[in-house]
Amino acid sequence: MNELTSRLNRERRFLVLLGVICLALIGGALYMQVVLGEAPCPLCILQRYALLFIAIFAFIAAAMPGRKSLTFFEVLVVLSAIGGIVAAGNHVYILANPMVSCGIDTLQPIVDDLPLAKLWPLAFQVDGFCSTPYPPILGLSLAQWALVAFVLTTVLVPLGIYRNRRRG
């Protein structure tokens, strides 16, 4: 096995790990929803979509045989993470400034009309308000943790591409 193949395999393992972590985060959100009674808002659901897209694209990328197809799906992973940054960043802003929320989430009908909301309503249907604060986890709100995860994904995936291909 040459050095480039070894680097690409390391990159693929990282992508599989990233996909598993994203699915675990969705599972954790479902646990908090069902067991702890923390109802998801439209921005929570959009963050779940971003995590799901990251996982799907990461798994597809890990299965790609060539460098170009692998890179294409890694770009989709990063774009999904940027979408997650937008949703989580907006959510963090609303939680920090509850007065900007009018109490009515205008995103709810849009998010509830997305296909997965009809296929799997428990996981992808809106049931709460974005301005509802829940107890922090290790000092950060769930939206802040999601923002950290999306930023790390946006930084680490391109860094891995650069690191694993700079000599290849």
UniProtKB/Swiss-Prot annotation:
One of its GO terms (cellular component) is plasma membrane. InterPro entries: DiS_bond_form_DsbB/BdbC, Disulphide_bond_form_DsbB, DsbB, DsbB-like_sf. Disulfide bonds join 41-44, 102-130. GO terms for biological process: protein folding. It comes from the Bacteria. Residues 1-14, 66-72, 164-168 are cytoplasmic. Belongs to the DsbB family. This is Disulfide bond formation protein B 1. It comes from Pseudomonas entomophila (strain L48). The gene is dsbB1.
